């Protein structure tokens, strides 16, 4: 997918260069061969105005391609981070419960190789350079103990989702949620008005970020439940 986006971006850049050259060549030929007092409908210079409009639209498309490439890279990084975490949790579960997992399927092996992960007979292994420190594991792996979101984990969340959320503010809000649900084991989901009533610094970006990190659960009404 990354290669396809790169090729598309290169094609747009080449097309832009070709149009630039064509415009300069046509402008020179028209200025040399067409009288200045020729009729407007017969004057090829009008074609250059249309070409300029086409170039403007083409430049806008190039910008969109670059934005798509950036978002695609962020999405791939986020997928790798979450897959790394899942693999580590599965390995920890296997070691703790002494359970033998099913053999990795051919499809799973191809997916792991595509993401740069090594595969043995039963599990997908995370390369050392991609392993997450213990403090970066999601809260669900820490047996109910509060663990702050790390800067690396936050940066793995797509910019379109986390917006301008600050790490300190996100952790402060997450801690408020954790303390509330820790003391109220059987309490229902929290509504937005209830959170504001409790002076929680809630925002849509914070909720989406924590949901993306699988730390909270949001229902259709926007009610929040902590995933302990």
Curated annotation (Swiss-Prot):
GO biological process, one term: attachment of mitotic spindle microtubules to kinetochore
InterPro entries recorded: Ska2, Ska2_N
Cell division listed as a keyword: yes
GO molecular function, one term: microtubule binding
Pfam family, one: SKA2
GO CC entries: cytoplasm; meiotic spindle; outer kinetochore; spindle microtubule
Keyword line: Cell cycle, Cell division, Centromere, Chromosome, Cytoplasm, Cytoskeleton, Kinetochore, Microtubule, Mitosis
Cellular location(s): Cytoplasm, Cytoskeleton, Spindle; Chromosome, Centromere, Kinetochore
Signal peptide stretch: none
Keyword Endoplasmic reticulum part of the UniProt annotation: no
Primary role: Component of the SKA complex, a microtubule plus end-binding complex of the outer kinetochore that stabilizes spindle microtubule-kinetochore attachments, promotes alignment of chromosomes at the mitotic spindle equator (chromosome congression) and assists suppression of the spindle assembly checkpoint. Kinetochores, consisting of a centromere-associated inner segment and a microtubule-contacting outer segment, play a crucial role in chromosome segregation by mediating the physical connection between centromeric DNA and spindle microtubules.
Record's subunit section: Component of the SKA complex, composed of ska1, ska2 and ska3.
Family: Belongs to the SKA2 family.
Name of this protein: SKA complex subunit 2
Species annotation: Salmo salar (Atlantic salmon)
């Amino acid at each position: 997918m990354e290669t396809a986006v790169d090729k598309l971006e290169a094609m747009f850049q080449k097309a832009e260069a070709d149009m630039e050259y064509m415009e300069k060549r046509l402008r020179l030929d028209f200025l040399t061969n067409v009288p200045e007092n020729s009729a407007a409908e017969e004057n090829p210079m009008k074609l250059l105005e249309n070409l300029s409009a086409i170039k403007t639209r083409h430049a806008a498309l190039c910008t969109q391609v670059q934005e798509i490439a950036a978002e695609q890279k962020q999405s791939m990084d986020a997928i790798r981070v979450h897959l790394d975490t899942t693999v580590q949790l599965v390995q920890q579960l296997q070691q703790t419960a002494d359970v033998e997992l099913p053999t990795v399927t051919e499809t799973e092996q191809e997916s792991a190789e595509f993401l740069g992960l090594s595969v043995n007979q039963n599990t997908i292994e995370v390369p050392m350079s991609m392993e997450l420190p213990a403090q970066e594991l999601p809260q669900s792996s820490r047996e109910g103990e509060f663990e702050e979101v790390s800067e690396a984990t936050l940066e793995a969340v797509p910019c379109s989702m986390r917006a301008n959320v600050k790490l300190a503010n996100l952790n402060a809000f997450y801690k408020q949620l954790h303390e509330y649900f820790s003391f109220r084991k059987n309490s229902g989901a929290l509504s937005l008005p209830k959170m504001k009533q409790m002076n929680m610094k809630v925002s849509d970006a914070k909720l989406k970020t924590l949901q993306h990190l699988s730390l909270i659960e949001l229902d259709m009404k926007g009610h929040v439940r902590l995933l302990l």
